[in-house]
Amino acid sequence: MNPNQKIITIGSICMVVGIISLMLQIGNIISVWVSHIIQTWHPNQPEPCNQSINFYTEQAAASVTLAGNSSLCPISGWAIYSKDNSIRIGSKGDVFVIREPFISCSHLECRTFFLTQGALLNDKHSNGTVKDRSPYRTLMSCPVGEAPSPYNSRFESVAWSASACHDGISWLTIGISGPDNGAVAVLKYNGIITDTIKSWRNNILRTQESECACVNGSCFTVMTDGPSNEQASYKIFKIEKGRVVKSVELNAPNYHYEECSCYPDAGEITCVCRDNWHGSNRPWVSFNQNLEYQIGYICSGVFGDSPRPNDGTGSCGPVSLNGAYGVKGFSFKYGNGVWIGRTKSTSSRSGFEMIWDPNGWTETDSSFSLKQDIIAITDWSGYSGSFIQHPELTGLNCMRPCFWVELIRGRPKEKTIWTSGSSISFCGVNSDTVGWSWPDGADLPFTIDK
């Protein structure tokens, strides 16, 4: 085949391929056009696939008013409820540096509230967190029993002193911040600022560091303003939906109230507090919903504060021996009897025990009938406080008494650059319990301390 014949042959093949391609394209266009005509003339023809529409309705959790009218449940001992192990976990995890943890429950859940230092454990910003009051401290909360971290915690308020409680509808939080000579308490209801309380003595306005108490839609808290080592001023506040509706200043000469642990009982409120001035036994105040109040000291010779003397003869006024300084604590009143929570050490914040004194609310002897170990004297404890589980949460027909214990680690007792704590909690039951030691258990110092 000569060159001209090759050119003619190749050209013919290309022309045939082109014609075939053109015919295929024309066929494709005709097919699409016919399909469109069929759909146009049969508009009611069912779709080839089934389409389903899902409708979602958001259901709000039911709200109730926590009545608080029930009496405390009868109990024979204390069952462990939670332990967060936050210092142990914080050696390798992102855990907040905290102090002053406390627990409060709604009708649906219990949460741990705590005052952060704006820092994480084992981090440079944990240096110097032994300080109580700073602009970096905030009130946050997380589910009870969980280590407080940036991933499970909810911001509540800017605060270096705080309280919180649930009325059955929303959370009330009280956060105090600002300078010592002019701090302000910011009240929030459902996360929204609803009221404020200005320091009235311009001397470190402070509140409970544990839950406030709610009865029939009203919540109650106690605040202190004035010296920590002599006569100060104390007020009870009645709060409804986040707004102060009434307050009364206690007429309490020679009394000293700080960091009260309050709970509802049969429609009234009982608060057991810290005397940082001159009492090694604990002062109390009880009041009704109109803020008509009574005051006193726990009479028992089983003393509840630390430091304190050895148990002996008590007083229904302040017991002055070793009465200066103190630690936040609690007790539960049962008629003339009292459950007393206290450190095991008479001089330091170490160990913890629960003691039942069947006549200790009104009598001054030091006899008691039950003691349950919580923390060994060789392990650190710290603040402690009460909280209540309402019948709307438990399904019981009574108020379940519970308490938490702060387990302080770090400065000033240990060689670290930081101060923080974990917590444990117990609830009262009328069944079998056991005494043991549930310490913090962290191995110090951390890497940042070396």
Curated annotation (Swiss-Prot):
Protein name in the entry: Neuraminidase
CDD domains, per the entry: Influenza_NA
Comment field on protein domains: Intact N-terminus is essential for virion morphogenesis. Possesses two apical sorting signals, one in the ectodomain, which is likely to be a glycan, and the other in the transmembrane domain. The transmembrane domain also plays a role in lipid raft association.
Virion surface side: 28-450
Hypervariable stalk region: annotated span: 36-71
Glycosylation site list: 50, 69, 127, 216
Active site location: 132 (proton donor/acceptor), 383 (nucleophile)
